[in-house]
Amino acid sequence: MMRRVAQMRAEKMIGMLFGMRKIISSVVAGLLCFGASISVPASAQADDLQAMLKKAGQENAGVDLMAGRTYVVAETLNVPTGVRYIRGHGAHLDVRTKGTSSELASAFALAKETSGIELSDFTLNMKNSSFSSGISGDHISNVTIRNVTMNDVNFRGVSILADHGDVSNVTVDRSTITMANENDGVVPIFVSTYRVKDDYTGKGAEVWERYVATGKTADPMFKNTDIKITDNTIDGGYYGIEFSGVTSSHITGNTIRNNTRNISMQDRSSNNTVENNQLRDSISSSVHIAYGSEHNDVKGNNIVTRRAYGQGILQAYQGSKNNTFSGNSVTTRDKHPSWLLYVGPDSGGTTFTGNTVDGTANRAFVGVESVWDGDSSLSHLNDAKDNPHSYMVQGESKKPSGETVRYAGGNGPLENITITGNTFTPRNKTLPVVYVGAEVSKAQNGRQEVRGDIKGINVSGNTVKGVKGNDYSELLVTHEGSLDKLGPATISFTDKSVVAQ
């Protein structure tokens, strides 16, 4: 009897084990079906990699490269939708793609409408590539690029494009991008939005030409939003990070060095935050905001440059309203920019507050101008041949093509500029701490006359370190320009005490 009971118990246990085995097998099979991994052998080259990416897309799977191995990439690797991840495990890719100016190449090109992929933990060596991006994607969402290294990039590192549809929720995090040079058009992280075509589309320097002729910027065709550029190290390139038509995005915690401009936000790049970045050795601006880019918040950045001889280190101009620069530390040494802080035409509502700024400028420590008109800027100067504080210092400036012009922007009054609560350490005894220039411009080339009154400007409560005559010439210099029967333009301050009383 006891033997029979024991036998029954054993049979019951065996049945339970078989049942559990079936359940476990079913779960594992389901997991493998959704998130299978395809391992790429060390011997694989471009054709093999492409085939495995295609298979991963079909199976909704990820791709694992082999740790410590090097793969040769001679042609663009097209990553289809459905690929869940590409994990490098420390692998290197020798990128030899050959694009052209009209047909760009990439090491990895994400398919349109890609969503839900992570690319991580590999190195792209791009010395032998041309007109290529390391990673590119157009009309993508929910994409993460993390812990990727790109070396000797001679065109683009990461390209995030809204050329054929909206872009949202793309992250570039803890990656290192080193460029081969700082040439115009060479950009480590390039985020751009296609613009509606008009009469200026396709012309050289179309953004500049459009704005100067019409005072307008082109409409973006798609949305490019929720981009997060965080904790990366970037060295070289014309811009370190370029936003064109990008909104509601973040550039945070990056170290960016050796660029013409460290960060550029143009073409209606609005409602973005630039925070806690280490910006080093720009030739021109460290943070540049232009062409209809509004409501951006630039705060808590640490900026040091020994190479700057271009425009303002922190600046907004050409229709870029209501931008705030606060709590930034700015230091210039050796070479000198035109200004350290600057606001230009059609950019009312600009605020500089709580910044600590130390260095030497070539025109003024802080500059505010309503209209870039050379003839107006030279008016009422007792026959002087230049206005040393103005953008149009000798009555002219150069357009991007290099051609000299005497008008370069400004379509009306400049209102509600705030420069308060900053700490300034100027180091040029021949220049003022603050220059404010209100200018006019005659009607010409189909453009109406412009009167650039400056209204409601507040320059007060700042701390200015140094001694007048030794470290700066005056606290405040103003200029109110006029031409024939036009003007003078006027300046109305709510407070012009400059320093804390």
Q: Where do the language-model regions lie?
A:
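C-terminal segment of classical bacterial N-terminal signal peptides
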Residues: 34-42
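Right-handed parallel beta-helix
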Residues: 111-259
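Extracellular beta-strand-rich solenoid/capping regions of secreted or surface-exposed proteins
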Residues: 50, 54, 70-87, 94-120, ...
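Short glycine/acidic-rich loop motifs that flank beta-strands on beta-rich extracellular proteins
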Residues: 73-76, 95-101, 127-134, 153-160, ...
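Acidic Gly/Asp/Thr-rich repetitive segments characteristic of extracellular carbohydrate-active
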Residues: 42-64, 76-78
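Extracellular beta-strand solenoid repeats
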Residues: 64, 72, 78, 87, ...
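Bacterial N-terminal signal peptides that target proteins for export
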Residues: 6, 11-28
